[in-house]
């Protein structure tokens, strides 16, 4: 299920794939700590740091707690489970971009 189900947004399937691909190649995205090693804070916003391959706090960041929650679900759940989650379309473009940048594809 995923690529053959037209009701699942292609960006959702791709983001799921990118995160799992990065994990399989040994570069799992840290969704618990920022690039400085501090725990992620739900009140802060972040940007993806391509050089450090992680999230960096930034006042003008476009990644917030909701994006991080979806990234965590993508990294730990099956595409069948994720497809049942509603309301992700609003944050999916940013999540897709982070996953794609992290996988370096």
Predicted region positions:
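Non-catalytic alpha-helical scaffolds and adjoining flexible linkers that form interface surfaces
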Residues: 1-105
């Amino acid at each position: 299920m995923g690529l053959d189900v037209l009701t699942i947004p292609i960006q959702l399937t791709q983001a799921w794939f990118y995160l799992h691909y990065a994990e399989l190649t040994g570069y799992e995205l840290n969704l618990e700590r920022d690039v400085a090693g501090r725990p992620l804070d739900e009140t802060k916003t972040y940007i993806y740091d391509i050089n450090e391959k992680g999230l960096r706090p930034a006042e003008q960041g476009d990644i917030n707690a909701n994006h991080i929650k979806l990234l965590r679900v993508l990294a730990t759940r099956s595409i069948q489970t994720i497809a049942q989650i509603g309301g992700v379309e609003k944050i999916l473009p940013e999540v897709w971009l982070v996953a794609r940048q992290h996988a370096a594809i």
